[in-house]
Amino acid sequence: MYEHDKRVVLTLDAGGTNFVFSAIQGNSQIIAPISFPSVSDNLDKCLANLLTGFDTVMKKLETLPVAISFAFPGPADYRNGVIGGNLPNFPSFRNGVALGPFLQHHYGIPVFIENDGNLFAYGEALSGALPMVNQQLSISGNTREYKNLLGITLGTGFGAGVVINNCLLNGDNGCGGDVW
């Protein structure tokens, strides 16, 4: 889908225990993953490790990134980049943190944040398990095509994403598939 896209995007898998940073170009990871503790109970240390992680990746790049895109666990105002609420894995974000605007101001590039379960499920629906299953069905002569998927993430916490008729179910808090 994006294999010929030469733009570089910084990435982050934000877990309750660790942040894992990298960069992608096209459909390929171009920097080996770099981990830092998330320090999720101390906002200042958590934000400092976010900046350190992205800075470390940027020093390894040959070209400047055009955006930051990453997954974050739990409910949030993902459209506006505000993370907060009852997040057991990130107690320091309880009162809300404008993480997207903070990173966009610091790096001067767009920031896209989405629920981790949603990104996992949508990725599998677009270019992972779902197309693979449909291709195997087609090869075997079966005309059935699946358009629905439930993806489950397991880490420090538990998350999920739901795709129905090839559309991601976001819900009113950005995590329509999560179980609370």
Descriptions of predicted regions:
Residues 10-17:
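Asp-based phosphoryl-transfer active-site loop
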Residues 18, 29-30, 83, 168-169:
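Hydrophobic "anchor" residues
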Residues 44, 48, 67-68, 76-148:
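Glycine-rich phosphate-binding loop and adjoining helix at the ATP-binding site
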